[in-house]
């Protein structure tokens, strides 16, 4: 098993390519007016409250904004700007729990400098969905963040008078007209347009003109398209993301190998949603696949909604995986498809080991892992894993047969000489150690396979209790104490010279307000759905 896993890890089986940073973030860095809009949203979210033109003939304000993007847009974000709505109220309540709202709002306003005075006008214009998206898949995956200009942002405003004030007093100068929309250039040299009651921004003047032409035609992205792509996530979210993953993968030369995988090639779109509720923040993810030709055996994790239990250990991140053999078999099938020549060599080496040691690595190792795998990971780098076995006694006999080759496999995986110690009579653990002090101990204890890089964790792992994670669905589950994780992360960052207090003018982040981090993923032939939720202890 170690041999197979080291091979698969070294191959880096699925490389989907760099999808790039957030388009919204790129846009903010390029366009001062868009930055102003985003900061206005930020200050209102912290506060938790808020104060017919050529582009207004769509079915809704969201539809109007989306139609400035091409129908084949690979990426679009819709941000709810209804500052008196439930999402902003919940976000404001959350900032109050950490007692940082005033300080963060001050820093956001300071970042605007001279344009901070425009905040009130912008906030009056908000209320509808603000859309930012990419116009070209190849540019999105290939261009560095600061060089990609292939994006467009739009919002149908509620107060056109407030929007008009952004161009008053020399803040922007007219720069022509396109398809009935007035084009302006702001004091940073960035182009934007006012199309009736819609504000349109873009990465370049050419992109802006193309967006206006797209809106004037019939080939724009629609609300129906966007809703279909985000159907599997919350529709009442503060932020929804639409991704045409299939298009992005096909546009990236780095993803050519990944697309050889049957499951990856079946991926079509994905939706992501960020939702604030009283007492929690949630991120929902839904990846849609074309089920034609797919079976449960083709999935990256085991199919079905049944969720495994996680280890009941505090202070670290606890993961659980139902039927880990499914992941290994998926990885092997993908490796064989991507690089058949290398995989054939791997199979030859595996067959040689099987002949010499009289074992069947698939039957005697991989097929044994048909129960649950539970893993605990600390932020200090210590980890442990416990796997249920079909036949523990048979697995122990297989480990005994593999004693001759384990050192060579470990040296191949680490690239250096290792020490290998077999268990003494009455003991359970094998040990592998490098000259640098790294170690792995493993063995069958009380009927389960235990593997860890720390002897203390290994000693307790077999008898540690487990617990059911509330709301978890699917073969992969995650659980952690969010407060302890945040505290440890901040302490480690401070030890490396980063002090969050310096960024917040001496104020401390109240991590005690955090509760649990819960995550899970469920796979079917129709797609992969999951969620991550952070609860807060203070209601």
Which functions belong to the PLM regions below?
Residues 11-47:
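Sec-dependent bacterial lipoprotein signal peptides
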Residues 178-184, 424-432:
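Short, hydrophobic/aromatic-rich segments at coil-to-beta transitions
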Residues 49-150, 155-183, 227-268, 273, ...:
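Structural boundary/hinge residues at secondary-structure and domain interfaces
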Residues 157-160, 204-207, 389-392, 454-455:
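Helix N-cap motif at beta-to-alpha junctions
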Residues 184-252, 435-505:
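A conserved glycine-rich beta-strand in the N-terminal activation segment of trypsin-fold
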């Amino acid at each position: 098993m170690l041999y197979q896993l080291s091979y698969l890890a070294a191959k880096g089986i699925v490389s989907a390519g760099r999808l790039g940073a957030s388009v919204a973030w790129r846009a903010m860095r390029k366009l001062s007016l868009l930055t102003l809009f985003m900061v206005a949203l930020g200050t209102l979210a912290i506060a938790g409250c808020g104060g017919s033109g050529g582009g207004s003939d769509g079915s809704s304000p969201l539809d109007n904004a989306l139609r400035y993007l091409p129908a084949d847009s690979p990426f679009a974000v819709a941000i709810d700007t209804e500052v008196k709505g439930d999402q902003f109220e919940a976000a404001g309540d959350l900032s109050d729990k950490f007692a940082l709202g005033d300080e963060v709002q001050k820093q956001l306003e300071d970042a605007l400098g001279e344009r901070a005075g425009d905040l009130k006008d912008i906030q009056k214009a908000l209320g509808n969905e603000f859309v930012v998206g990419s116009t070209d898949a190849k540019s999105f995956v290939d261009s560095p963040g600061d060089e990609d200009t292939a994006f467009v942002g739009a919002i149908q405003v509620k107060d056109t008078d407030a929007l008009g004030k952004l161009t008053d007093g020399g803040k922007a100068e007219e720069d022509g007209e396109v398809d009935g929309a007035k084009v302006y250039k702001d004091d940073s040299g960035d182009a934007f347009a006012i199309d009736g009651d819609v504000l349109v921004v873009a990465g370049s003047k050419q992109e802006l003109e193309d967006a206006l032409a797209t809106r004037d035609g019939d080939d724009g992205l629609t609300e129906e398209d966007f809703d279909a792509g985000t159907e599997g996530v919350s529709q009442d979210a503060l932020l929804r993301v639409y991704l045409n993953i299939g298009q992005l993968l096909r546009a990236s030369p780095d993803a050519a190998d990944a697309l050889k995988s049957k499951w990856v090639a079946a991926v079509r779109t994905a939706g992501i949603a960020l939702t604030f509720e009283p007492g929690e923040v949630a991120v929902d993810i839904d990846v849609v696949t074309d089920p034609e030709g797919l079976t449960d055996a083709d999935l990256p994790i085991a199919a079905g909604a049944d969720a495994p239990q996680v280890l009941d250990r505090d202070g670290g991140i606890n993961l659980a995986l139902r039927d880990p053999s499914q992941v290994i078999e998926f990885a092997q099938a993908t490796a064989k498809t991507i690089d058949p020549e290398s995989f054939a060599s791997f199979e030859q080496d595996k067959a040689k080991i099987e002949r010499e040691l009289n074992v069947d690595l698939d039957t005697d190792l991989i097929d044994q892992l048909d129960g649950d795998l539970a893993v605990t990971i600390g932020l200090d780098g210590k980890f442990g894993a416990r796997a249920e076995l079909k036949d523990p006694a048979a697995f122990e006999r297989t480990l005994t047969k593999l004693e001759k080759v384990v050192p060579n496999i470990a040296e191949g995986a680490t690239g250096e000489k290792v020490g290998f110690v077999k268990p003494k009579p009455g003991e359970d653990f094998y040990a592998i150690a490098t000259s640098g002090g790294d170690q792995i101990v493993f063995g069958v204890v009380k009927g389960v396979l235990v593997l860890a890089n720390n002897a203390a964790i290994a000693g307790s792992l077999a008898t540690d209790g487990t617990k059911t994670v509330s709301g978890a669905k699917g073969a992969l589950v995650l659980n952690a104490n969010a407060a302890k994780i945040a505290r440890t992360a901040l302490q480690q960052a401070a030890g490396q010279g980063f002090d969050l207090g310096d960024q917040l003018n001496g104020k401390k982040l109240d991590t005690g307000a955090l509760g649990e981090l819960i995550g899970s993923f469920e796979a079917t032939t129709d797609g992969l759905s999951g969620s991550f939720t952070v609860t807060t202890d203070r209601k």
